[in-house]
UniProtKB/Swiss-Prot annotation:
This is Ankyrin repeat and SOCS box protein 2. Residues 26-45 form the UIM domain. Substrate-recognition component of a SCF-like ECS (Elongin-Cullin-SOCS-box protein) E3 ubiquitin-protein ligase complex which mediates the ubiquitination and subsequent proteasomal degradation of target proteins. Mediates Notch-induced ubiquitination and degradation of substrates including TCF3/E2A and JAK2. Required during embryonic heart development for complete heart looping. Required for cardiomyocyte differentiation. Specifically promotes the ubiquitination of SMAD9 and targets it for proteasomal degradation, leading to avoid excessive accumulation of SMAD9. Keywords: ANK repeat, Cytoplasm, Cytoskeleton, Phosphoprotein, Repeat, Ubl conjugation, Ubl conjugation pathway. The SOCS box domain mediates the interaction with the Elongin BC complex, an adapter module in different E3 ubiquitin-protein ligase complexes. It comes from Mus musculus (Mouse). Component of a probable ECS E3 ubiquitin-protein ligase complex which contains CUL5, either RBX1 or RNF7/RBX2, Elongin BC complex (ELOB and ELOC) and ASB2. Interacts with SKP2. Through its interaction with SKP2, likely to bridge the formation of dimeric E3-ubiquitin-protein ligase complexes composed of an ECS complex and an SCF(SKP2) complex. Interacts with JAK2; the interaction targets JAK2 for Notch-mediated proteasomal degradation. Interacts with TCF3/E2A; the interaction is mediated by SKP2 and targets TCF3 for Notch-mediated proteasomal degradation. SUPFAM superfamilies: Ankyrin repeat, SOCS box-like. It is found in: Cytoplasm, Cytoskeleton, Stress fiber. GO terms for molecular function: cullin family protein binding; ubiquitin protein ligase activity. Highest expression in muscle, heart and spleen. Highly expressed in cells of the first and second heart fields in the developing embryonic heart. At 9.5 dpc, robust expression predominantly in the left and right ventricles (RV) and to a lower extent in inflow and outflow tracts. At 10.5 and 11.5 dpc, expression is restricted to the myocardium with no expression observed in the endocardium. Belongs to the ankyrin SOCS box (ASB) family.
């Protein structure tokens, strides 16, 4: 027998004559090499080359005593793992590490079976050799004959030892199971004719019929069914042979199984039926077959997901179309309350969404606590968003509280999702459809300011977004829009030009009196850690944060252009006094402010912040309009 030596990059067989490769090495070197190889093999899995070589190498079965067999693989039993260098060297050095023994020859029984030598087997039996004794893995010569497809040898062993026909290996594999796995139909038929039990399963509870379906061997299935194999036997996952054949879209095998008594409504451990498998995997022909044979088109798994839901989730358009044509209910929700339309919108499949829209109940959608608009906006599926808006879905439908809590910012509108994604087109679509920009806990305008997207800001303001938005969970004495824009003076000026209220920035609670210590970094960005109402943050407090304080002078300078006579608190004066070039800002704040400036503020206040954009329509000289719009600061 040749011994296989595993190397890092490849496998090669080394026979008696090839041990000369290591003849120049001392015993200590050989042992060291073997130990290193053994340690390396333990710390790494098989390389792609090794896996490929293993799949292409002819099966080398286990032998009778004293040779051993490696555990078999359920997919192609029994695969024998190649010997590593450590085992090869240790086989060369027997019990005495310093004595070399010759490798044993192949067992004569196995040799006779592999070569199909029936006469040799008969002679051994006549000579009294016991061929019904298993090896350490429970394999009999009968198993070997079935595995190698040696029909003549198989019949000899059947006749000599009829009581071993259903004997199993340690992996619970019978000769019939092995013959089926190897697709030796003549051996399969011979065993069944000799009385082999067709429903004995392996350790995974897979029967020969199941393996025949797995290998799409219709003739093997036909033979097994003819010999009364149980078509409804379940493996350890609860799958039947019909589940397996449906997953492979094997209509011929499905026909044989159903004719042999297979139940089309059989369920696995997750309550999944064959029709559900067909819908899930997109096997349209299998689906048609099962529907024709009476399978429930509205079948649901243990999580309440329907076949239509799974087909929509996996974007099998033809399957969805067929299910709907057969009357599938589009209003069956899964355990999370989601309908097929929800998952189709989430996936962004426009065609499936169009098929589901006419058959989906708006009441069921509202009851789910989430609109398909939310899912389409969250995933930037603009085409689906357009289809849903065209179907007149409620653009202001909020997320249910339990769903909103899944997001840290407690978002609730589809518009918020679009703004968070910085999707200007989707934002415009939703606003044109009537989306309210002031419904969320945190205004979408604040998100747009954080992104610095002027186009989105303008869209939101044009459609009524509150430019003086506040954050309820982080209360401030001044608009949060100013807080978010402080690090970009041009953005701050843009917001002030559009009517943002700067007066609260100078209405300090402490005035000229002493202020509390400057806040720690992150003080204004952390949520409250207890149940007490958070304290209201003053403008001067926020301006004292390290990441903002270096811009204190320019920020105050911009804000002074949009307020009248105000009083700087002691903290703001400290900031201005900290840099001598900012002295002019302190002078600018001293009352009284210029009359023209006060008149400008009065006119803008009379117009109102929501009509500031109409300043150009006033019957006034162009120079005055430019002054009102802060286009001429002189």
């Amino acid at each position: 027998m040749a011994t296989e030596i595993s190397t890092r990059g490849r496998q090669r067989a080394i026979g008696h004559e090839e041990y000369s490769l290591y003849s120049s090495l001392s015993e200590e070197e050989l042992l060291q090499m073997a130990i290193e190889q053994s340690l390396a093999d333990k710390t790494r899995g098989p390389t792609p080359a090794e896996a490929s070589a293993s799949s292409q190498t002819n099966h080398q079965p286990g032998h009778f005593h004293p040779w051993t067999r490696s555990p078999s693989s359920p997919e192609n039993p029994p695969a024998r793992a190649p010997l590593g260098l450590f085992q090869g060297v240790m086989q060369k050095y027997s019990s005495n590490l310093f004595k070399t023994s010759q490798m044993a020859a192949m067992d004569p029984v196995l040799k006779a079976i592999k070569e199909g030598d029936e006469e040799a087997l008969k002679i051994m039996i006549q000579d009294g050799k016991n061929l019904a004794e298993p090896n350490k893995e429970g394999w009999l010569p009968l198993h070997e004959a079935a595995y190698y497809g040696q029909l003549g040898c198989l019949k000899v062993l059947q006749q000599a030892y009829p009581g071993t026909i259903d004997q199993r290996t340690l992996q619970e594999e019978t000769a019939l199971y092995l013959a089926t796995c190897r697709e030796h139909l003549d051996c399969l038929l011979s065993l069944l004719q000799a009385g082999a039990e067709p429903d004995i399963s392996n350790k995974s509870r897979e029967t020969p019929l199941y393996k025949a379906c797995e290998r799409k061997n219709a003739e093997a299935v036909r033979i097994l069914v003819r010999y009364n194999a149980d078509a409804n036997h379940r493996c350890n996952r609860g799958w039947t042979a019909l589940h397996e054949s449906v997953s492979r879209n094997d209509l011929e095998v499905m026909e044989i199984l159903v004719s042999g008594g297979a139940k089309v409504e059989a369920k696995n451990v997750y309550s999944i039926t064959p029709l559900f498998v067909a819908a899930q995997s997109g096997q349209l022909e299998a689906l048609r077959f099962l529907a024709k044979h009476g399978a429930d088109i509205n079948t649901q798994a243990s999580d309440s997901a329907s076949a239509l839901y799974e087909a929509s989730k996996n974007e099998h358009e033809d399957v969805v179309e067929f299910l709907l044509s057969q009357g599938a209910d589009a209003n069956k929700a899964n355990k999370d309350g989601l309908l097929p339309l929800h998952v189709a919108s989430k996936k962004g499949n426009y065609r499936i969404v169009q098929m589901l829209l006419p058959v989906t109940s708006r009441t069921r959608v509202r009851r789910s606590g989430i609109s398909p608009l939310h899912l389409a906006a969250e995933r930037n599926h603009d085409a689906v968003l357009e289809a849903l808006l065209a179907a007149r879905f409620d653009v202001n439908a909020p997320l249910a509280p339990e769903r909103a809590r899944l997001y840290e910012d407690r978002r609730s509108s589809a518009l918020y999702f679009a703004v968070v994604n910085n999707n200007v087109y989707a934002t415009e679509l939703l606003l044109l459809a009537g989306a309210d920009p002031n419904r969320d806990v945190i205004s979408p305008l604040l998100v747009a300011i954080r992104h610095g997207c002027l186009r989105t800001m303008q869209l939101l303001l044009d459609h009524g977004a509150n430019i003086d938005a506040y954050i309820a969970t982080h209360p401030t004495a001044f608009p949060a829009t100013i807080m978010f824009a402080m690090k970009c003076l041009s953005l701050l000026k843009f917001l002030m030009d559009l009517g943002c209220d700067g007066e609260p920035c100078f209405s300090c609670l402490y005035g000229n009196g002493p202020h509390p210590p400057a806040p720690r970094p992150g003080r204004f960005h952390d949520a409250p850690v207890d149940d007490k109402a958070p304290s209201v943050v003053q403008f001067c407090e926020f301006l004292s944060a390290p990441e903002v304080s270096r811009w204190a002078g320019p920020i105050i300078d911009v804000l002074l252009d949009y307020v009248g006579n105000v009083q700087l608190c002691s903290r703001l004066k400290e900031h201005i006094d900290s840099f001598e070039d900012w002295a002019v800002i302190k002078e600018k704040a001293e009352p009284p402010r210029p009359l023209a400036h006060l008149c400008r503020l009065r006119v803008r206040k009379a117009i109102g912040k929501y009509r500031i954009k109409l300043l150009d329509t006033l019957p006034l000289p162009g120079r005055l309009i430019r002054y009102l719009k802060y286009e001429n600061t002189q």
